[in-house]
């Protein structure tokens, strides 16, 4: 007897339809799985046998062959437990086959027949909609996430008997639906605000400029000056996620299984990996490729604290995602492209002891030690960071001051205004922010007045900026002009942008 059940396989951050074919034949009782199954899929036969028996069904004492088609795509994870079990029962004619073509099934089985959550419910729901199946049957824990996709019937189930009864028409399962507008309102609040930060007005201004133009930032300052606190609040002044951005961000987190019960991610991600992370952990990889931190920070902020402590090869692999907004992971079975459009915020001490620029504590480092410490971060990587800003230690008067800082909402309003100007400027292009401008765009949109040009020339000659750094100054100047509502880049905008090249000036 033969039965076919629809399921799906994850490929990158997308999903592909998989047909689970089950054949029961005479012979010695055994269960063989073919179609490039990974370890967890091969182990599923024991879970399925126990679950079927513990739910009161008879497991067929026959030669069972399960094929996962197409066979050239690697199948991993435990999401095939449910479609395999349903296929076996359908082949034994315990389930009506008429409904099987209408639904796509995923879910991990416990030994008692209950269902556990699986990874990738959102991209699988999108694949089901694309394949024009009627609905998706999956564990109830994954249902809110999958229900974000409209125009498909999402059915959350708790155990194997519930699925069997539903497919036989003996029991109904309530369709899970969510209101996207309510979800956005519920999950779009941040727990921190820029008015939590005392002082550091010039750093806040630099971060406002960075947010307005999507520029990468490096914060240089002694320990305890507030670098991490400022970085964590950067997402609160970035423009709100659009629905398309939220869905793409949620897909990445869904594939990694780290949604933690959320139906959708409605706030900008903030990722802060430890400096001991490997290159595969940062950009993605592994035997079975998975997204790295740069992809988990997609549409948000990637914060690298203690930048010189990261391994040099780890930092160098970030060049591609910083330039292209995506990362390609190549393996023998093919290449997978992950989105990685993020704002990089790095933090570092000015020297090994941390007090080179501190007016109160004396630095104990030699010039050679300082040079070696800073050389751990390569010039090409620093050139890709538009804004370099010093974060000094706060004085007591600033710490003890009771004056409330400007809230994130007020700063975000100005940032939104600048972003609107940029969207109008690039509406016929594939880019959407000043940081993404290429050489032709800079030539077209970053024309400066004569007095501003002379100021820029003097700064370039004195600081010895590279050609890429020169472009960064012009991009930042364009953003400052946008914040000021100015069509032309003026000398004041150039002067402020040059101030954001701290490392070029030796801090």
Which functions belong to the PLM regions below?
Residues 219-258:
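Walker A/P-loop
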Residues 136, 302, 386-389:
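Short, well-ordered beta-strand core segments
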Residues 40-45, 60, 67-77, 288-289, ...:
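Basic, amphipathic alpha-helical bundle interface domains used for macromolecular binding and assembly
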Residues 59-62, 99-100, 132, 150, ...:
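Short loop/turn elements that form and flank the Walker-type P-loop nucleotide-binding site
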Residues 18-24, 282, 386-389:
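Short beta-strand elements
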Residues 47, 51, 84, 123-127, ...:
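Alpha-helical scaffold elements adjacent to nucleotide-binding pockets in ATP/GTP-utilizing enzyme cores
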Residues 1-218, 225, 330, 469-470, ...:
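Peripheral, non-AAA+ core regions of ATP-driven protein-machinery
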Residues 192-205, 214-216, 251-315, 320, ...:
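Switch/coupling sub-region of P-loop NTPases
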């Amino acid at each position: 007897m033969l039965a076919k059940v629809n399921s799906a396989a994850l490929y990158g951050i997308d999903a592909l339809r998989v047909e689970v074919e089950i054949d029961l034949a005479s012979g010695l009782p055994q269960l063989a799985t073919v179609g490039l199954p990974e370890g967890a899929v091969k182990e599923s036969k024991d879970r399925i046998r126990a679950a079927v028996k513990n739910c009161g069904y008879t497991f067929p004492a026959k030669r069972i062959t399960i094929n996962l088609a197409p066979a050239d795509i690697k199948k991993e994870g435990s999401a095939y437990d449910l479609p395999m079990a349903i296929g076996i029962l359908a082949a034994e004619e315990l389930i009506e086959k008429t409904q099987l073509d209408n639904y796509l099934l995923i879910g991990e089985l416990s030994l008692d027949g209950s269902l556990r959550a699986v990874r990738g419910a959102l991209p699988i729901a999108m694949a089901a909609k694309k394949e024009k199946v009627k609905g998706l049957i999956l564990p109830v824990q994954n249902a809110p996430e999958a229900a974000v996709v409209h125009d498909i019937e999402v059915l959350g189930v708790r155990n194997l008997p519930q699925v069997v009864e539903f497919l036989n028409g003996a029991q109904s399962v309530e369709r899970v639906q969510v209101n996207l507008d309510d979800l956005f309102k519920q999950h779009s609040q941040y727990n921190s605000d820029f008015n939590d930060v005392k002082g550091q007005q010039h750093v806040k201004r630099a971060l406002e400029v960075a947010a307005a133009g999507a520029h990468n930032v490096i914060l240089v300052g002694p320990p305890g000056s507030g670098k991490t606190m400022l970085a964590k609040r950067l997402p609160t002044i970035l423009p709100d996620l659009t629905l398309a951005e939220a869905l793409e961000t949620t897909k990445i987190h869904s594939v990694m299984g780290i949604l933690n019960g959320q139906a959708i991610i409605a706030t900008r991600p903030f990722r802060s990996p430890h400096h001991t992370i490997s290159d595969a952990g940062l950009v993605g990889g592994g035997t079975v490729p998975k997204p790295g931190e740069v992809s988990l920070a997609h549409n948000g902020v990637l914060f690298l604290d203690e930048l010189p402590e990261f391994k040099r090869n780890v930092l160098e692999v970030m060049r591609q995602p910083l330039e292209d907004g995506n990362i390609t992971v190549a393996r023998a079975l093919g290449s997978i492209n992950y989105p990685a459009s993020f704002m990089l915020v790095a933090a570092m001490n000015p020297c090994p002891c941390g007090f080179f620029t501190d007016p109160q504590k004396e630095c104990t480092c030699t010039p050679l030690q300082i040079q070696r410490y800073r050389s751990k971060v390569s010039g090409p990587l620093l050139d890709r960071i538009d804004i370099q800003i010093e974060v000094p230690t706060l004085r007591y008067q600033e710490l003890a001051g009771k004056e409330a800082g400007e809230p994130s909402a007020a700063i975000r309003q100005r940032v939104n205004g600048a972003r609107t100007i940029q969207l109008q400027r690039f509406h016929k292009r594939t880019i959407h922010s000043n940081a993404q401008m290429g050489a032709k765009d800079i030539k077209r949109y970053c024309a400066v007045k004569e007095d501003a040009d002379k100021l820029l020339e003097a700064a370039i000659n004195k600081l010895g900026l590279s050609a890429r750094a020169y472009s960064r100054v012009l991009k930042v100047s364009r953003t400052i002009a946008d914040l000021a509502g100015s069509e032309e880049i003026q000398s004041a905008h150039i002067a402020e942008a040059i101030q954001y090249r701290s490392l070029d000036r030796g801090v």
